[in-house]
Structures are given as structure tokens and as C-alpha cells.
């Protein structure tokens, strides 16, 4: 029987399945951070259980860390407690930890792939919704809750029901300046923020194959923003070349044998999907969200929509509420909307290619008066590589702030946040009310578009900036 990639990955990891019971899956990798793990470790301690597979468990600090100093106290008392608990728990249970002073420390979904912890064919979980990022490698990766974190620590397994399957095919070739971020925002604009609910999404088509691994990670990172359980891209030579030689990747003959298996990880001819969505890459322009969910998105050349133009009463009411929160008026061109802050970072867009794209725009220009612009590399290795290439100097000379690695202003759990009423062009993944700070107004864009907003003081079409 022909199978989809998701069905192959799921079936390969079933440990036990009985009639009328949820299947039990084996988990190959468990990624841990300071926010969703303390109670899970406490649960192990209370029942005198060890971590079953400490060698398959990797921890880092990211959500709470300050991006201005390595001082554990800098983001407040709650942050300090969570980070100190992670240090204590990893020491006690034998889990490898990339702490504030470790050269590999960074955002968990940046660290995993760059260290070769993430490999094709794996099941990967983390107490974080954007675990879907790792699906870019042809791995079944999804976020879990704290009680499930404890279950995986204790058993290296997890009960999971089968999801529905969705194929999203992006045909043709994207125009110059159009990035993975624009593609995924255009997809979510078409499906809506709940269009993938109950599904695991496989992204395919010529435009997807043309993406680098970093672009594919951006794509899968935001699968969750259309309501999907996970996102997948079938592994290919691009994947294998990225993985080869990384710290935790197989070596020598083991790598060659792994590649032979990884090549089988693709949807069979004749396999059927529950839902199919198609987009044409050449029709995708630079995208900017205007509302308070990622599905409220338009091209940068469009005008702010009128809620009256929505036929669905729920969408109309949502648009009215979003415009009121965002302080926007229907009919205003997006390029007339001024911004206060710019955030280039997050598990969506903080890798070296993202920083190069932003630096290309920033080079020889200056951040507009009254705008604060932050560049936050996703990890220690990304920061080191950017500095080796001189990107930090380009940003600093242009008036951007060059920060230490961390989740930063994506989620306002640290000391980087928006003040009430401030408008931000952000490369992160969520534009919900208050996501970047109470009363903050978030517009999601690509790194190049964020840099363009920083130097012009408003949203600008990257295609017109030479």
C-alpha cells in the first residue's frame, strides 16, 4: 500500500498498538529548555525515576535569557529560577546542557539542527510548539506539554494518535527577493490560521525543493501557525549535504548507510492525502501581516483590508477587532505604515542566511530616526559565523543593536519587549495580541523586509530597494 512520508515515519516508530487504543511511539530525540521542563523533572524526582535515555536528551537555555549579558539574573527572578532549575536538573539526571556560557547555547530549534542532533527519519519532541521546525529534515517533530515532557523523560515513548495528511505544493520558481518566510506567510494567508488543524503537512513542489535547509526550517517552523500538528519536507541531497559532518551526525560508513535509508523517506507514488493545497510561487510577493494572527496577511503592495470586504461574519468580526488593536485604518497602503521597532531573530529567522539577507539591506544605510532595531543571532555558532563574515560590523555601523543569542523579543519572556502601542516589524512567527509585550503591535515579515523597514522607518517593498 502506497504511503505518505508522514505515514512512513509514524509507522516506523510504533512501539505498541492495540485495538481502540492510541498508538505508543518511540521518541528518538528529546529537546529540553528552561520553561517547560522544571515540573517534568520534579515529577521524575517524586517517583524516583531516572531519565531513561539521557544520551537522546539535549537541553539549552533560550526563552528567558538576556540578549545583552550572560548574567543569569538579568531577566528577572522567575527567569533566574527557571534557568537555575535547568542547571540543577541536567546535572542530577545526566542530561547534556548548553548553558549561558556554552559556545553552542542558543534557541533550541536552531541548536538541534546545527549540532546534528536533528536527523532525517527521527521522531523529535520538545516542550515548545515550534518543534515543527525539525520537520525540514524529514523528521516527525512536534511540540508537547509538560506532562508529556515528563513521560518522554521517563519512558522515551509517547502516546500519539494518527493525524490527517495534507499536501501543500508550491509550483514554479519564486521571484528574486521572495523568501521562505514570504512563501509560508502566503500559504497561511490561503489556508487561514486553522486550515491545517488535525493535519501533518508535507510541503513539496519545485519552489520548496529550491529552498536551502534554513529556508525549509522557516517553512516548517510556521506549519503550526496554520494549525497543523507538524510540517515535513522529504529529505534530499540538500538535506544530506547539510547534515554531513555535524557533531552528532553519523560518520563514515554509518553516514553512507543512513543516507541510503533516508532516501526512502518520501511519499510513494499513488499515496493519497486528505487535503491538497496548491500555490504558484511566481505569484507570491513580499508578505506582511496586518492583523493579530498569521493568516491576516497581505502583500506589501496591498492596502489594509476593509472588514466589510469579508463575507464570513466570523472573519469580519476578527478583522474589526484586529484593526482596532493594531491601530490601523482600512484602505491605508501598507507602505505608509510607520514602525517603532524592528526585531530580526527567533527560531523562524535567526540563522546565518537570515542575517546575511538583512545585512545586505542594512549595508551602507542607517536605521531611521526614532526606530530601535535588534539583531539577535539564533545561537553561539551563528553569532560567531556572522562576526567572522563581518555582519556584526555592518549592522552596528547602520545603527542596529547586535545582541547575544536567545529567543529575545519573539515572546517577551525576557527583558526584550514592546511597550504598549509600539509597532514592530518582526521576523518571528506569531503576531497575537501581547505576544511581544503588553499592547505591542506585531507585523511578521522576512529578514530582508525587516531590515528595509528599519532603514526607511516604514514597511517597504524589498524589490524596490537597490
UniProtKB/Swiss-Prot annotation:
Alphabetized Gene3D superfamilies for the sequence: Aconitase, domain 3 (3.30.499.10)
Top-level division of the source organism's lineage: Bacteria
UniProt-listed GO biological process terms: L-leucine biosynthetic process
Cofactor: binding details: Binds 1 [4Fe-4S] cluster per subunit.
Lyase is among the record's keywords: yes
Keywords: 4Fe-4S, Amino-acid biosynthesis, Branched-chain amino acid biosynthesis, Iron, Iron-sulfur, Leucine biosynthesis, Lyase, Metal-binding
Classification via InterPro entries: 3-IsopropMal_deHydase_lsu, Acnase/IPM_dHydase_lsu_aba_1/3, Acoase/IPM_deHydtase_lsu_aba, Aconitase_4Fe-4S_BS, Aconitase_4Fe-4S_dom, IPM_dehydratase_rel_enz, IPMI_cat
Pathway annotation: Amino-acid biosynthesis; L-leucine biosynthesis; L-leucine from 3-methyl-2-oxobutanoate: step 2/4
A molecular function (GO) term: metal ion binding
EC number(s) given by UniProt: 4.2.1.33
Coiled-coil regions listed in the entry: none
UniProt-annotated binding residues for [4Fe-4S] cluster: 347, 407, 410
CDD domains the UniProt entry points to: IPMI
Co-factor requirement: [4Fe-4S] cluster
Keyword check for Iron: yes
Family the entry assigns: Belongs to the aconitase/IPM isomerase family. LeuC type 1 subfamily.
Role description: Catalyzes the isomerization between 2-isopropylmalate and 3-isopropylmalate, via the formation of 2-isopropylmaleate.
Subunit structure and binding partners: Heterodimer of LeuC and LeuD.
Name of protein: 3-isopropylmalate dehydratase large subunit
Species of provenance: Salmonella typhi
Gene name, Swiss-Prot/TrEMBL: leuC
